[in-house]
Amino acid sequence: MSKICQITGKKAMIGNNVSHSKRRTKRTFDVNLFTKKFYYVEQDCWISLNICANGLRVINKKGLDAALNEAVTKGYCDWKSIKIIG
């Protein structure tokens, strides 16, 4: 499973650790990703999504159906990658 948000498409970024003497070493900034279950009213089932904190805010603002449709049209996820729980 890749570390990409299924709603916003956010993924890890690469940057630098900077020490006190200003030496720079490469590091990755990971996304605040977690697995969350939602009740999908349109299909009358529970689904599981890998989303970041910003993705949860998008779902709270727009609604689950609108956020999923927008993510599918932008190519962040497809309907086959969404896990249907029951």
UniProtKB/Swiss-Prot annotation:
Taxonomic superkingdom: Bacteria
GO CC terms: ribonucleoprotein complex; ribosome
Biological process terms in GO annotation: translation
Gene3D superfamilies noted in UniProt: Ribosomal protein L28/L24 (2.30.170.40)
Stored Pfam families: Ribosomal_L28
GO molecular function: structural constituent of ribosome
Entry similarity comment: Belongs to the bacterial ribosomal protein bL28 family.
Name of the protein: Large ribosomal subunit protein bL28
Organism expressing this protein natively: Phocaeicola vulgatus (strain ATCC 8482 / DSM 1447 / JCM 5826 / CCUG 4940 / NBRC 14291 / NCTC 11154) (Bacteroides vulgatus)
